[in-house]
């Protein structure tokens, strides 16, 4: 399996050796990132975006890559994250297969793919790697740090590990720890991959590839990324046309089944299964409460920033809205002027990607006031 690196990616060589939180280290590792806008002379207009598990660093198009990005409607000139004003950096997470060093990368020491020899990955490792990029660009303090989904966890880790790195923070559909439901879902996703005989303890290749396992894992993910409300309105119980079905017992019959199958089919050859395992587990392990003797609100209160916005969707079952409320409350206890906003978007966890009409205005208003 190979990495999937967007054209126009930039790369930062991490300090070597790069120590990992749970032990081990990386040698000659790198982080992929992309930028938009221009850094001002005082280097005070920078925004860092930390993405979720599967996205690359290509959040929006730019001169080196004209393809629309995964947050195209949110980022650009005159958009909520206005690149006419801000210098924006988006980092591909350490452990991914989209340009940053991960299990699908080659170990420069052994000249073989890391696979399961990659050190245990924590959210904190991605946080430390991202800040190396920020410092390499000559930025001492970010105007704002934005994290969505898994990136919301990474952003909190950055703020805990690197005090004074940002003046403000926007946490979008993120959390300060993984809840049992989310851990259970991700556990099933990892099990589906590992039970595929082609996974072969991580030693698969393009000929013998755990496609079935990764496809099931992705389907489970998609179900949790959206909401029952959206499924009802979008698909109902509508069945497929006869030319879309076959005579296979228990085969696809409903449109919702076909949607999941199509979505999973597109995903399986654009993401490495071992990387999926590592990143998924890192989310389960993350817990802000570890920074304050088991008290999650006290852990959040250790963060020192001027302003924050925690925003999410009431239909999110993967990162429930209570978790964004918790982030805002904890930050307030530490003296941050923190605002919480819950939206009625029907798209569940993925709402921040598609409901720009809902998420865009509060993000724009927050940044405009900085």
Swiss-Prot record:
Keyword Hydrolase: no
Residues the UniProt record annotates as site (Important for acyl-CoA specificity): 186
Active-site residues, Swiss-Prot/TrEMBL: 149, 316, 349
SUPFAM superfamilies, alphabetized: alpha/beta-Hydrolases
Record keywords: Acyltransferase, Amino-acid biosynthesis, Cysteine biosynthesis, Cytoplasm, Transferase
PANTHER family according to UniProt: HOMOSERINE O-ACETYLTRANSFERASE
Subunit comment: Homodimer.
UniProt protein name: Serine O-succinyltransferase
Species this chain originates from: Xylella fastidiosa (strain 9a5c)
Gene name for this UniProt entry: metX
